[in-house]
């Protein structure tokens, strides 16, 4: 019979697997928590596509409320988002709600036809938060009414971000850098 330490040794010597060529298509979701898509920092997800997705964020019914952002995507190379809409419950908003979309450590990405705002109407968080991203395009997207900042970026110098044909007339600020 093998000991637990035998399994742990095998795991530590194993190579990381690769996950690539993923498609999420035509989804309507009613969420009560943050949705997370996360690759490994040493082996990011590759070639990830999200098409025609509507997310409706609702108040959590548990006592231990953890939802912050609607969708967090982390450690991805080659991300394409086409037609993503995020709506927040305005009747019973959660105090911890922040951004509609968060990208962390994402390279070679394209966001086309995004529509949304931050979680709390007239709150201080951005609709789209970008942290350690590179070679990206955000185009033909729209800030919804009550949007504070449409896009917030960290690491301005390294990003290679292109913005094109976005409708930010309903946002107080189109982009900010922190």
Language-model segments: what does each one mean?
Residues 1-178:
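Extracellular/periplasmic carbohydrate-active domains that bind, remodel
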């Amino acid at each position: 019979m093998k000991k637990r330490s035998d399994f742990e040794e095998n795991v530590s010597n194993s190579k990381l697997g690769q996950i690539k060529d993923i498609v999420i298509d035509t989804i309507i979701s009613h969420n009560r928590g943050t949705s997370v898509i996360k690759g490994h920092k040493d082996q990011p997800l590759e070639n990830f596509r999200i098409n025609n997705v509507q997310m409706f964020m609702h108040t959590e019914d548990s006592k231990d409320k953890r939802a912050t952002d609607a969708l967090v995507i982390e450690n991805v190379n080659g991300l394409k988002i086409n037609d993503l809409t995020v709506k927040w419950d305005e009747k019973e908003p959660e105090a911890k709600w922040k951004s509609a979309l968060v990208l962390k450590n994402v390279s070679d990405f394209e966001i086309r036809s995004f529509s949304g705002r931050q979680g709390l109407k007239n709150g201080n968080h951005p609709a789209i938060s970008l942290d350690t991203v590179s070679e990206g395009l955000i185009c033909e997207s729209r800030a919804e009414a009550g949007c504070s900042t449409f896009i917030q970026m960290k690491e301005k110098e390294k990003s290679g971000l292109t913005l094109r044909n976005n409708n930010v007339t309903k946002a107080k600020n189109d982009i900010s850098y922190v």
